[in-house]
Amino acid sequence: MHKKQQQDQSQIKWISDFIWNIADDRLRDVYVRGKYRDVILPFTVLRRLDAVLEATKDAVLERKKLLDAHKVVEQDGALRMAAGQAFYNVSEFTLAKLKASAAGQRLRDDFIAYLDGFSPNVQEILAKFSFHNQIQKLVDSHVLGYLIEDFLDPEVNLSPLPVKDADGRIKLPPLDNHGIGTVFEELIRRFNEDNNEEAGEHFTPRDVVQLMAKLLFLPVAERIESSTYSLYDGSCGTGGMLTVAEESLHELAGQHGKEVSIHLFGQEISDETYAICKADLLLKGEGEEAENIVGGADKSTLSADQFRSREFDFMISNPPYGCLLYTSP
């Protein structure tokens, strides 16, 4: 087990370093360093989703064709079922097909068609990342094609399936949902440290969150039963508190011989951090929980509480205390 954990950590570090180096190699003369995240984070999300959807791509396209033929208006549920995921893409493109596409404006048009083919939940994440605003700049600087090529590099595997050689032996191990979530969180941490003028607004140190989780759960540890619990963060940022608190509650319940199911809920006013939080949950395979995260510039918890009628079993939060209350919309 210890050896496997070491392998997992080595794999995660290798992938994180690889993606980090893409930013330095491709974006150095195109963006100021503090803006690398605007491209790299959504591209990491795209590559993982693309890899996850690869196995069911044909089934989704067939289902889409059938639904259109029968003039079915509400297609989301059926397409999710065909994909076997909480998301899907109905465009004819994959990143691999885009890699073989022509350069320049043709690649731009094909790439936009690919993005527009994603399910509404992924579209929202990309919109909150303002990713479409980056595309023309990437095309004009002749970087878009190289980025696609880099993220498809055969020496790195962002897929949940292993890469095998011609003899069927595993060349690169699979990257499970927890692994890609850890990679994504590591990239976020590095970007926050690299551009730390506002890092505190987006990131609470993990050891602090772990202490907060203990203060939240330990006083009621003996009362935790094998049941379903809800956990809420009204200023959830990138979702780190929810994730750590969820892990802590599972661990505590296990220590007492209990098995719990946990539903996460959160609200976040910053577009980018909301996008990161939702993307992180999708990458971890927690699509249902991602639906419980709401946010955006018009979603202040103070003036536009999205869970006004809900009650929760636990709440954990670290709101931006330096923000004047009257500046909240």
How would you name each of these model-derived features?
Residues 1-220, 289-301, 306:
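Non-catalytic, mostly N-terminal accessory regions of nucleic-acid modification and defense proteins
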Residues 202-317, 322:
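Conserved S-adenosyl-L-methionine
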Residues 47, 322-323:
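Glycine-rich nucleotide phosphate-binding loop and flanking beta-alpha elements
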Residues 326-329:
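Conserved small/polar residues in nucleotide/adenosyl-binding loops
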